[in-house]
C-alpha cells in the first residue's frame, strides 16, 4: 500500500524491512531471583535481563538510582528503542557511525546510554566483528545473551569517577542521552569522555531536537505536536535534565574539554511518509512507528510529576499527536543532530 492511499495516513514499514535487526534474535527468556517481572501479572515473561522496579501510571520503571531516569524500561519501551535504532539505520543507509574506524582491526569502543544494547550489537555483528565494546547504561535492559566482543556495564554516568569504565577508547558513542544527564554535568561528562579516549580517538553524540518544524506553510493552527513539545521541554527543564538542543553549547563544552575538529550534521526526522522519495518515505515510516509507540513513555512521568497534569490528559495529548502525525499534508519533522570531535593525537605544544 502506498503512503498516498493509506486510510490513516500512517503506513507500516514495508515487508522487506519489517523484521527487526538481527541482534533482537539474541534475546532469551530469563528471570532473576528476587526481581519483579517487567510484565503485568499473568503476562508472558520478559525476554531481557530483569531488574527491580516499580509500576507507575501503567508502566514499569527502574528502581536503581530512582529519579535519574524518568522513563519506563518495560517490554513496550525496549521494543520501541529497538525500532528507533532501526530508524537510525534506515535513515543513515546502514551506517552505524560517521567516524573513521579500522574495520579490520580491534577498536575499543564505549556506548554510553546503550539502552537495549542494540547499537553495540549491530557494530560487532555487521560492521567491525573484532571490536571490543563496553555497553554502559543505568538500567539492565540488555538481552541475556550478547554477541562476543560486547560487555555490558550497569553504571551511573553522573558518578564523580569513571574508574570502572573502559579506557583508551577509539570511539565513545552517545545517542539520545538528553534528559538522562543533569544539565550542570554535561561539561564534566565531555571532560571524562576525553579522558577515556585514546589519542586520536573520537566522540560521537547524537540527539533529536524535539521542537517541531514544518516544510511549507501547511500545518495546524493549534498543533498537538507543538503543544506536546512545549510540555515535554517544560517538564524536563524542571527536572534539570533538559532536552533542549544547543549546538553552540555542545561545541563550546567539547572544545573546553580539549576536543578538536568539531563537526555537526543535521537530518530531518519526518513524522510521516509523505515524501515521493523512496528512502525518505521508508525512514519516515520507521520514525512514525517509533514516535507513536514512545509518546506516552516519554510523557507520562515527566508531565504528571513535574507539570501536575492528569494522566488522562497526558494520554489524550499523545493520542492527538499520533493523529496529527498521520495527516500526510502536514510535513512535520524533528531534527537529528550528530556531533563528532577528536582527541588530538598528541598534546598541544
Curated annotation (Swiss-Prot):
The entry's keywords: Methyltransferase, Nucleus, S-adenosyl-L-methionine, Sporulation, Transcription, Transcription regulation, Transferase, Virulence
Record region (Disordered): 1-46
EC category: transferase
Pfam families cross-referenced by the UniProt entry: Methyltransf_23 (PF13489)
EC number: 2.1.1.-
GO cellular component: nucleus
Summary of the knockout phenotype: Leads to reduced growth rate on plates with D-glucose or D-galactose, decreases the expression of mycoparasitism-associated genes, and impairs conidiation.
Main location as per UniProt: nucleus
Gene3D superfamilies tied to this protein: Vaccinia Virus protein VP39
GO MF terms, alphabetically ordered: methyltransferase activity
SUPFAM superfamilies assigned to the protein according to its UniProt record, in alphabetical order: S-adenosyl-L-methionine-dependent methyltransferases
Compartment list: Nucleus
Gene Ontology BP terms: methylation; sporulation resulting in formation of a cellular spore
Catalytic activity: L-methionyl-[protein] + S-adenosyl-L-methionine = S-methyl-L-methionyl-[protein] + S-adenosyl-L-homocysteine
Superkingdom of the source species: Eukaryota
Protein family (similarity comment): Belongs to the methyltransferase superfamily. LaeA methyltransferase family.
Role noted for this protein: Methyltransferase that performs automethylation. No other methyl-accepting substrate has been identified yet. Component of the velvet transcription factor complex that acts as a global regulator for secondary metabolite gene expression. Controls the expression of the gamma-pentyl-pyrone gene clusters. Required for the expression of cellulase. Regulates asexual sporulation (conidiation) by environmental stimuli such as light and/or mechanical injury. Required for oxidative stress tolerance. Also plays a role in defense and parasitism on other fungi.
Assembly and interaction partners: Component of the heterotrimeric velvet complex composed of LAE1, VEL1 and VEL2; VEL1 acting as a bridging protein between LAE1 and VEL2.
Name the UniProt record assigns to this protein: Secondary metabolism regulator LAE1
